[in-house]
From Swiss-Prot:
Name of the encoding gene: gpmA
Protein task: Catalyzes the interconversion of 2-phosphoglycerate and 3-phosphoglycerate.
SMART domains for this protein: PGAM (SM00855)
Site feature (Transition state stabilizer) residues: H182
SUBUNIT field: Homodimer.
GO terms (BP aspect): gluconeogenesis; glycolytic process
Residues that hold substrate according to the record: 8-15, 21-22, 60, 87-90, 98, 114-115, 183-184
Name this protein carries in UniProt: 2,3-bisphosphoglycerate-dependent phosphoglycerate mutase
Native source species: Azoarcus sp. (strain BH72)
The keyword Isomerase belongs to this UniProt entry's keyword annotation: yes
Listed EC numbers: 5.4.2.11
């Protein structure tokens, strides 16, 4: 039996402003820092410790992870970073307010862009300043493969191979793993682990900074999964995430 912990980053500045973020490298809010600290304290109270952590190359996930590790007195822990764990790229929606976008295009259309499996938002056009090709953290990513937009299927296509080739061998070696990432990169991984259908994945919402535990059998198939926080806390946090893409009444 193996056990891993998944953790979405704490509230970011654009979460607070209800903006589509994607690959934009925004920081944590004061609340987000507190959420990350609370997550670390919860993991400590529940007796969790880790041998290796994985995260994206975006600061909101990195800072969340560092705060958690500080609470666990484990800042020495080896950490592997990969753009493959980045948030889904939201294309031309990046930076736009979700409620304002819903008011313009309709709640249903924005729900499709946010939560559908295979329909991407409008793509960034060549020359858009949001296409940060020259960012050194993406030095290994060929320009031709740099995303201008992504649907969840595209995110799955980069997350799952990373899981299988990089993370799985570490789990099988007996190392205790923490993955600190993003709402949609975690949705991609959970879809794969739980075998969630393309249609049902629309309803999956990942709350910020709430440790999610997966217990896996010898074949790394989920035996059970659960949040460490109580059900009412998780239900309210998931509802808040679900409501972000709706027009204000």
């Amino acid at each position: 039996m193996y056990k891993i912990v998944l953790l979405r980053h704490g509230e970011s500045t654009w979460n607070k402003e209800n903006r589509f973020t994607g690959w934009t490298d925004v920081d944590l809010t004061e609340l987000g820092v507190g959420e990350a600290r609370a997550a670390g304290q919860l993991l400590k109270r529940e007796g969790y410790s880790f041998d290796l952590a994985f995260t994206s190359v975006l600061k909101r996930a990195n800072k969340t992870l560092n705060i958690v590790l500080e609470e666990l007195d484990a800042l020495w822990l080896p950490v592997e970073h990969s753009w493959r764990l980045n948030e889904r790229h939201y294309g031309a929606l990046q930076g736009l307010n979700k409620a304002e976008t819903a008011a313009k295009f309709g709640d249903d259309q924005v729900l499709v862009w946010r939560r559908s499996y295979d329909i991407p938002p409008p793509a960034l056009e060549e020359g858009d300043e949001r296409l940060n090709y020259d960012d050194p953290r993406y030095g290994s990513l060929p320009r031709a493969r740099f995303p201008r937009t992504e649907c969840l299927a595209d995110t799955v296509a980069r997350v799952v191979p990373y899981w299988e080739t990089v993370i799985v061998p570490q789990i099988l070696s007996g190392r205790r793993i923490l993955i600190a990432a993003h709402g949609n990169s975690l949705r991609a991984l959970i879809k794969y682990l739980d075998g969630i259908s393309d249609g049902d994945i629309v309803g999956l919402n990942i709350p910020t900074a709430q440790p999610l535990v997966y217990e896996l059998d010898v074949n790394l198939k989920p035996v059970k999964s659960y949040y460490l926080a109580d059900e009412d806390t998780i239900r309210a946090a998931q509802a808040a995430v679900a409501g972000q893409g709706k027009a204000k009444g």
